[in-house]
């Protein structure tokens, strides 16, 4: 290698020199990197004939032992990848700034760049490289660019070659295993026992040679690994692994934490409590103050909370690096308040809320005595949880919290916790509080702008076109700069999520240009921004989620945010966006996210061979290599969390895509084989989907009864009886598995929400199938009371809507549902739910038409149509109602609206028929809708004197009212009766020999006018 010639390896050394000076690098890594750079520079200067080192050998043999693999994957390979010749020129220009610095003094002060000494070894090398580069002509630049490209291509090809070799080796191992299947069971058991014994002995021998620090790191990684197996492996197998670690490393304190998480995961309260006490007995008082400051770890575990239905893994915890604030240097009982806080969390998880509150009071008392503000901030968070309606109303002795509820609320305590965690610079807790605040707004529907002005933007008001804030305040100010109130002509675009699902959360003054990207595939399901107060509500919901993601960029926080977005869009009625964010949550889940070794660069073999995740390339060969690498990584990926699986299955069921839902459930059962021992989430999901499927079958059988003969009708009736029996069993099972003491951090989610969902399913079954209106009303009243008492105000809208439909179906009490319709409408307006508002408005429009208030009906129709532009069924119903209101005034417009209604309905029906999974939830209602359309058209054309169209739509109406099969049966019966009469008459003629005049029986007439529509005619 010529020392006077620029090579790709020299360019790589220059990249590392620049990173050595100004990169984020630890001291010991910086020292090792300097030795590596100096050695390679000397080799380039004194060994001209040595062949240049390849990139793969350089990384595999030297660089990966100096710098972390994560840096090599995410930054280093991008640094040495140049997309054009201009990129090489810009890089060389940046090398000159290493000696003199940049002209921008502000950037120098902010970044604190370190200059390179021109007389040092590194400085002399960089100067030679710059000198050689300045002497290169344009043809030489092209050649250097091609060499760099080939330099990277060789690296990719080497990775691909190693992958193929490993795959071949794995295939050979599989073949050898297949050949040894003939071994007897006794020999296999003996061999397995011997292997287990050898593994344990080797395991213990290897662990004995670990240093204390390595032991802690090893147990930390084992904690994460074993915790990710809960619900997947059998409890006995996990327990054996935990016992093996205890026997090997009995003095390592975190071993007992593994046992604690294991017992929490499998819902063993007594053993969890014992392990918690044992864990803190080992931890307490065994570390000096210097050890605490050096380790920077409190060993405190708090729930990685999921605010929709609980976390996918009930014992998924993260460790926070909090600085302990104490008045004295005494380390005795240093961990006592945190031990009590963990006791609070343990009682809360198992639904023992009284014990949890008493333990929280003790933790607050100890923290106040020691002036431990970090512990008090955590206590505020847990106090806000205990003050929730769903918690304190579940207590058997709720008088414990009466004095607190008289002066405080959960939202006030939560705001206080947000302020305290911001002041103490606790970003993890601050992110957790923001997501809790977002969930509170989502459930209760309350909003105010004070939280934005007092908490979010207290330090972020930029005037006179200033876009930068001071970096010397705290971590939260750094992250909240994305939410600044920019004055005096600032252009503010705030993209808060993927795929156009954006919710802008900035309040801009004085001619700001807000680009609000609230569209979602042009399917917004009804103008949420039409309402004046909706901006503040959704600003309070979506803005805290984005702040939490800025504060904590871990995959667990991203998964929580995606589930909250999914719940919000599902509440709005947009199931497509809810499914989209659920799939994002599945992609962002990593059970080993807390691992110190967490990296997409995973070892693919026991020989420490690494697969690198490469960025974009310029060559097709590179793209093929990347695709193969991604496929290998996808095969090695961990399965998504159970919560995302179940939620996606429920969304498919809600859209009547049962085949997809069943496939997801089958995959869940194949992965989470022991999940039934951890909780009831998977069982609840299966029963809910089974209930929906049985309801569809009953509707299909009822519709088929009108199109089949008597034998088929009997079969359908028998099938309905079987389905109704199964539904009753499913309802009993759903009620049995619900538990009001299920905490929101449990794998099953909040218990009261599941109970309310069960009530809604039972009400729909009693009302739509069985016609049991009294039972339905009793359950509705009970469901409304539960929703009010336990903080589920968003569910009250559905109950009032169901109650108004019950009154609508019972004709004597039809106008009694007006108050319930208005209640559902007001609640839907307060929550800005477009579909619920449309349903309530349709019920109110029908009442207006029944009382001849046509002007109010037309006005309400015009207000409702923009809300449901994407829902063809609701659009069809609204146009039908509009046509009814115009029959007496304008027949042409009425026919026009009837044509629109028919066209929308037929489009919806054709889309459903093309889909293999037809949505038949409203088949009976749809038939009634089409029947009314044909009936009204036949009446209007009759009044206009258009006999042809009148007969056409009368036949269509008759075909729906009396199916063709039943008409054919009637005709056959009439023919048989006529033949019998003719035979009888012939017999009489032969006996009496007297003429008899045959009497002609009139055919039965079919009424074309239902009694409901007589008044409109």
Swiss-Prot record:
Major localization class: nucleus
Keywords per UniProt: Cell cycle, Cell division, Mitosis, Nucleus, Repeat, TPR repeat, Ubl conjugation pathway
Region (Disordered): 451-527, 617-636
Cysteines engaged in disulfide bonds, as pairs: none
Cell compartment(s), UniProt: Nucleus
InterPro entries: Apc5, Apc5_dom
TPR repeat locations: 30-63, 182-214, 252-286, 337-370, 508-541, 642-675, 756-790, 838-871, 876-908, 931-964
GO cellular component, one term: anaphase-promoting complex
Keyword Nucleus listed: yes
Annotated Low complexity bias: 451-525
Xref: Pfam families: ANAPC5 (PF12862)
This protein's pathway: Protein modification; protein ubiquitination
GO biological-process terms attached to the record: anaphase-promoting complex-dependent catabolic process; cell division; positive regulation of mitotic metaphase/anaphase transition; protein K11-linked ubiquitination; protein ubiquitination
Family: Belongs to the APC5 family.
PANTHER family: ANAPHASE-PROMOTING COMPLEX SUBUNIT 5
Name of the molecule in the record: Anaphase-promoting complex subunit 5
